[in-house]
Amino acid sequence: MALPKTLHPALTPDELAFLAEHDHISIVPLFSMTRVRLISGIYGPFRPPSASRVPLWLGLSLKKKRKCRIVPPEWLSAERLQAFLRDEKENSEGFERLPRRFMEISKVLLDIASDDLSQPTLLRSLLKDIREVRQAKIRMGLQSEDVLQNDYLQVMPFSSLCPVALRRHLTRYGIGDQSHSLGTV
């Protein structure tokens, strides 16, 4: 059963992943080429084994064609994710600061470039644990206003909440009404 438009979240997880593809990552090209001029900018030169910075969408496209290896962001390692998880669990008052578009970039890299990542199964598990801890905090925050006002709450965990529960919470605090679209809150 499809939800009415007023109960749809502002952005779907796929739309958030699309937006994250504009962030830059490092790649190690498996080909040689001088600079390439695209609408979004000039990238290159591409000379193996030197790393190049490109938008995530370009890195993913080259990866699918087996033209590069993606260098994972420094925060996408088992040690860093374990530290994020530990800090998130210890901070019961709010949310820990995570890198920009943390969940979206992680998901895309694990889906397309898992062979370039160290211990992808462990990374998936840690990311799931972090997401679950944050979602539990959000659910608890639906009882009070405080958690929802935290600056470090990222879009993806918030957008994955049940739209009906989110609508009920927003209405309770006078932030929206039944005719108000979630996309404009």
UniProtKB/Swiss-Prot annotation:
Gene3D superfamilies xrefs: 1.20.58.1020, 3.40.5.50
Pfam families in UniProt: PSF2_N, Sld5
Biological source species: Cryptococcus neoformans var. neoformans serotype D (strain B-3501A)
Record-stated family: Belongs to the GINS2/PSF2 family.
Subcellular location: Nucleus
Function: The GINS complex plays an essential role in the initiation of DNA replication. Has a role in chromosome segregation.
Keywords annotated in UniProt: Chromosome partition, DNA replication, Nucleus
Stated name of the protein: DNA replication complex GINS protein PSF2
InterPro entries tied to this protein: GINS_A, GINS_bundle-like_dom_sf, GINS_Psf2, PSF2_N
GO cellular component: chromatin; CMG complex; GINS complex; nuclear replication fork
GO biological process, one term: nuclear DNA replication
Subunit structure: Component of the GINS complex which is a heterotetramer of SLD5, PSF1, PSF2 and PSF3.
Superkingdom, taxonomy of origin: Eukaryota
